[in-house]
Design a protein with these regions (language model features):
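Structured mid-domain segments that build the active-site/substrate or prosthetic-cofactor binding neighborhood
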Residues: 1-75, 81, 85
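Catalytic domains of carbohydrate-active enzymes that cleave complex glycans
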Residues: 25, 52-228
Length: 228
């Protein structure tokens, strides 16, 4: 298997559709082979799924909002805004998310959502600074968006330059934040999954800090490199 990085994607917004499909087709049980690690807000995913399996008529929005309020505490309002932004970004871009190939796993995150999402998460971290548990949960969710930004760092940077947008990201800052989030989570789990998490952390933190460049073919030697 390749290194599995979690999505910056709140999957619980689609759980009710899945449960309804099961009910409509008389499915009364199913088996989940692998949770693929504790992905972005997987605790909330499990909470919403469990309650809907017990009673499919429950209001999905109330379940999600109640879970977000309890899970993120003082940062709940900002985290709800962030999670809804990620949901809306995927729906807006109408892009299929693939399981393999790390670049394609983050193809639904665009520059605008990366910038706005980071601004919202800055506010969430500030709101949670007096609550250690909530702050660490914000950090753990944020590392999903940070992974997307690191994977597409130079692509986004070039786009920002072309569109005249201020470039707000610093690669070292993001790498340090990712490393801290993984270390906090390993402390919380008592080291469970250490090898996998360290592999993901090392992979992200080893991404090149300069863009990979190639020689321009002689046929294009009179072209501006920025246009190629």
């Amino acid at each position: 298997f390749n290194i599995r990085l979690n999505y910056a994607l709140p999957l619980f917004y689609r759980i009710k559709d899945t449960v309804n499909a099961y009910c409509e087709n008389n499915v009364n049980g199913f088996f989940i082979e692998s949770e693929c690690g504790d992905a972005d807000c997987w605790d909330i995913n499990k909470y919403v799924l469990t309650h809907l399996l017990e009673d499919p008529s429950l209001d999905e929005v109330e379940l999600i909002n109640g879970a977000i309020d309890r899970y993120f505490g003082p940062a709940a309002s900002d985290m709800r805004e962030y999670l809804e932004l990620m949901r809306d970004t995927l729906e807006k871009n109408e892009i299929k998310v693939l399981c393999c190939g790390e670049d394609s796993r983050f193809n639904y995150v665009d520059l605008d959502s990366a910038i706005k999402g980071s601004e919202i998460l800055d506010r969430a971290r500030e709101a949670a600074k007096g609550d250690i548990k909530s702050a660490k949960r914000v950090n753990w969710v944020r590392r999903c968006l940070d992974a997307a930004i690191l994977m597409r760092f130079f692509e986004f940077k070039d786009q920002a330059k072309r569109e005249g947008k201020t470039w707000p990201f610093d690669m070292k800052t993001i790498k340090d934040r990712v490393a801290t989030a993984f270390e906090e989570h390993l402390e919380f789990t008592g080291g469970r999954g250490e090898a996998s998490f360290n592999a993901m952390k090392d992979y992200l933190c080893s991404l090149p800090e300069e863009p990979t460049t190639f020689d321009i073919p002689s046929e294009l030697s009179d072209e501006n490199p920025d246009d190629i």
